């Protein structure tokens, strides 16, 4: 079976997914829709697909699945529409910035027996997958503590920050999902701290640029997350999992893996400059996983429930900062 795709949204992340779909032997990109015709046309020319409206893709009999890469405030409505249309759905995170709206959306997906995958691409990074495999294989015993460091080379434009939902819902949400993925238990308590250390304009926009979070599970396991909108040395992405019998870690990746030693000392190439190059394989792997699940009718993960859980943690972190206390997660 070849899964036939429609792409909704032809912006930066839409281009990433267009490439991932078109590069997969079990998929074909049939059509693209975007509010800006020139953006849609560029993808259509690059991947030999058609430009259609969202309505046409929704009704199309030659499309099995859609990838939603539109602005966040359109995600939930589009998920509901395409679930009712019987299409399998891959949606970039988050489903919505409001937990209540996400729950409403999930009811529609459940009622229609829809297939929904949420784009937490880091689960599909080969290095992070190897960390999870080491845990599953018992190499480090029982997981006790997870440490996640995620720092961007620079802050996004303030206009973006104003509509992003804030750093916890926009940036840390990836790390909330990764913490759940590695802990093996649901966090029940969140303690967060946040500052404006990078750009005062971010603070004026009502957000933070430097945050730390501690998640705790009912059994006492912990995940410690460190985020910053500044890393002068490149895109900083590290994970460590400490267990009862050892530790496993994934270090920063570089575009070229060489090391030079001479009279001037040791030198290595710089880190990747941002997520599109650092997570190239992850984007391809997540689409491949989605395609496989659609073809075989197997369980899809990360699911809508995973998206909801990560957003609930983000909301708890926002509340923790505002009220300067630990926040419990509702069951």
Language model regions located:
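Short acidic low-complexity segments
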Residues: 50-61
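Rossmann-like dinucleotide-binding domain that binds NAD(P)(H)
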Residues: 158-222, 228-233, 305
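C-terminal helix-rich "cap/oligomerization" subdomain common to oxidoreductases
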Residues: 1, 65-68, 290-331
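Basic phosphate/pyrophosphate-binding loop/patch that engages nucleotide-derived ligands
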Residues: 107-115, 129-143, 242-243
